[in-house]
Amino acid sequence: MSNIPAELKYASSHEWIRKEEDGSYTVGISEHAQELLGDMVFVELPEVGDTLSAGEDCAVAESVKAASDIYAPLSGEVLAVNEALEDSPELVNSDAFGDGWFFRVMPSDVAEIDNLLDAEGYQAVIDEE
């Protein structure tokens, strides 16, 4: 069974968010998602300064098995991207909730967080797959 940290929020499309001290949110894909995709070979990230809409495809995770769109769990401006993934996409596999993060976003509507799932709700989504 996949690790699902309780302190994070999740989208049913397998992205997670973690609130940072400055009010921004770090975004990545869940351990379950990286397990389904397999070994990462390339990650395409949004650009710093991009404005995202919740649910918009904004990144791509490409593995030996497939390429998968990554969706913005929140609307807002991209503040940072994980440049380490450019040379080391396998960080998504080895540390999905840590060094394998994708980007940070400053939300334009924090109420959107209420649309995301807690760990228990996300586990239910996985169980239904």
From Swiss-Prot:
Residues 24-106 form the Lipoyl-binding domain. Pfam families: GCV_H. Binds 1 lipoyl cofactor covalently. Signal peptide: none annotated. Its cofactor is (R)-lipoate. InterPro entries: 2-oxoA_DH_lipoyl-BS (IPR003016), Biotin_lipoyl (IPR000089), GCV_H (IPR002930), GCV_H/Fam206 (IPR033753), GCV_H_sub (IPR017453), Single_hybrid_motif (IPR011053). The keyword Repressor does not apply. The modification N6-lipoyllysine is found at residue 65. The keyword Repeat does not apply. Keywords: Lipoyl. One of its GO terms (cellular component) is glycine cleavage complex. Belongs to the GcvH family. PANTHER family: GLYCINE CLEAVAGE SYSTEM H PROTEIN, GLYCINE CLEAVAGE SYSTEM H PROTEIN-RELATED. The glycine cleavage system is composed of four proteins: P, T, L and H. The glycine cleavage system catalyzes the degradation of glycine. The H protein shuttles the methylamine group of glycine from the P protein to the T protein. This is Glycine cleavage system H protein.
